Amino acid sequence: MNQKLLIWILQTGEPLPSDDGLHRPMRAINLANALTSAGHNVVLWSASFNHQMKVHRCNGYKSIQYSENLEIRLIPSPGYKKNIGLGRLFDHMILAKNLKKLLKQEKVEPNAAFIGYPPIESASIMTHWLKKRNIPCLLDIKDQWPSFMVDALPRGFQSIGRAILSPYFYLAKRAMKETTGLSAMADDFLKWALDFSNRERTNNDLTVPLTTENCQISDDERKSAIQWWEKQGV
């Protein structure tokens, strides 16, 4: 019988299984479903603030026992109104600060972890905590932050921008160096992370495209779909 593992997932900007309404499964839900289906226990760390809806899921910290094998932990943060702006930076700073407080109280360590990047701050906090305890983790690169912010500036201002964002560069490189492996949705993202952190590629670094679950359709549904496309001239 395979060993039953405890896996942590840290993904703060994606829909959660506990969210109301329909939502497209992304990294967090897909991985959690795969792990729990295999009989493992999963703790999914996320934010109390819903990035897509721009509303809070709860006030303060909350733990949700979503199923027998899946616990969802919501980390408090102030939230923000716009995807780009100081409000989001402040939210991520507070999110990381609160995550650090919660980790200090943690008594049960995971066997392994999967960490979404960005946010840089919380990813750096989590990888550092895991590294100190020799717990393997995979850092999932979803964005080329903070490099793309500097690259978007006129050439004459890029050195100034890099200096202003230097704390983010430090935390990002630390997270990428302290993780056991890197993953990304595309080869270009993985190459950027390896180059950014001066990290030699190993067998632990891999590209994992975002996919959706296979869905079963009936013969009637298939026939109806074919007829619809034929009407469109396809």
What are these regions (language model features)?
Residues 1-65, 181-183, 213:
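N-terminal subdomain of nucleotide-sugar transferases
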Residues 3-5, 111, 234:
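Nucleotide donor/acceptor-binding cores
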Residues 12, 77-87, 133-170, 213-215, ...:
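Acceptor-binding helix/loop patch of EC 2.4 sugar-transfer enzymes
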Residues 18, 88-98, 112-133, 139-148:
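An aromatic- and histidine-rich active-site surface loop
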Residues 38, 129-135, 178:
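Helix C-cap/helix->beta junction micro-motif
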Residues 44-105, 208:
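A conserved catalytic-core segment of Leloir-type glycosyltransferases
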Residues 111-112, 181:
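Structural motif
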Residues 136, 146, 161-234:
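Donor nucleotide-sugar binding/catalytic pocket of nucleotide-sugar-dependent glycosyltransferases
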